[in-house]
Amino acid sequence: FILCLCCALTVAQATGEDRLNDSDANVFGHVLDKKTGEHLPFINVLLKGTTIGTTTDNSGHYFLKNLPEGKFTLEYKALGYKTVSKEVSLKKGKTLEINVELEEDQIALDGVVVSANRAETSRRLAPTLVNVLDAKVFTTTNAVNLAQGLNFQPGVRVETNCQNCGFQQVRINGLDGPYTQILIDSRPIFSALSGVYGLEQIPANMIERVEVMRGGGSALFGSSAIAGTINIITKEPLRNSGELSHTLTSIGGTSAFDNNTTLNASLVSENGKAGLYLFGQNRHRSGFDQDGDGFTELPKLKNQTVGFRSYLKTSTYSKLTFEYHHMNEYRRGGNLLDRPPHEADIAEQLEHSIDGGGLKFDLFSKDYKHKWSVFTSAQNTDRDSYYGTNQDPNAYGKTTDLTVMAGTQYAYSCLLYT
């Protein structure tokens, strides 16, 4: 109710504010690579502490118009480059030209993280050590899901504990999987039931970055964060783009294949006030028998995922964000995979249907020093299962799990422009 009321009040307020916001205070310029001198496309240009931002176009140029008056900081950031900040004084009817050069960042210390203190903080200034897996790591390693990407993070190990069903758990500092808290967009909706097979169910193409914080974080994230915290940040729309890809991988050089098809699309309105990012994945992996004994070492998988993340800037000082994902997965391990599970000697078969999402409303004060957020997230998991041996007809089961959370957060920044 509070969230709906806030949105209604803000939308009602937005029209009047937009009329008053024709300040004609503008900033334009270009962004260059410091080493090569080439123009850089798709660089994020943000007015720090606000919801205002854009990206450079194909020629490396950008334009921000009708900005609020006052002293602000412009940030220029992109994957693989050090963040550059420029102080600006915006005045009514004045247009500024600001050109910048970006330098490659080999160790990614200038990235922004949210897992250290629940607020956006430069990784360099974060009070605790936060390691980041970005989208580049998933692409370079050809990882198709979260589990495959986490293997490239120091101090983190993903291990398979069952050859029949392929159950995987993540270990941080040697502790078992239940001692690690997994978050989606900083929300603890990834339940114990989802966590059993969830590492393979989250596709890489929905992930913007993964923040890994090793060590206890119970004060911030609850009693499950004893070994550490893994925070999955989903992708936001940045520019109009689309991508369709398919990979075919032979498992062990045999006739068992892993087929993976992904779809991504990003749509942003011309004025930058609304955006939508769509993602989808269809994966099929054959069951794999390494030693020829008739029992699988890797289970058969069929996985379909679809979802989106969108935002709407309801005014200059407010933003509404919505995320949704749907996952279907079938997995079967054991022997005699072409028969019903109760006719096999050993069989573990699971069918998952997962629906989850979140809604967040951010409201800033006019000087952007005060920020108030209201949020809610939920995830529902339905699982049909069979765990049995010796052709047991009574080994079928069904499990349902619903996780819902809601909250509010207030933040005050006393050093907004430094």
Residue ranges: model-predicted function:
Residues 65, 169-171, 187-214, 235:
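Short acidic/polar hinge/loop motifs at secondary-structure boundaries
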Residues 191-193, 206-208, 219-231, 235-292, ...:
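Outer-membrane beta-barrel translocator/receptor signature
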Residues 285-305, 311-313, 317-372, 378-401:
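Flexible loop and strand-edge segments within Gram-negative outer membrane beta-barrel domains
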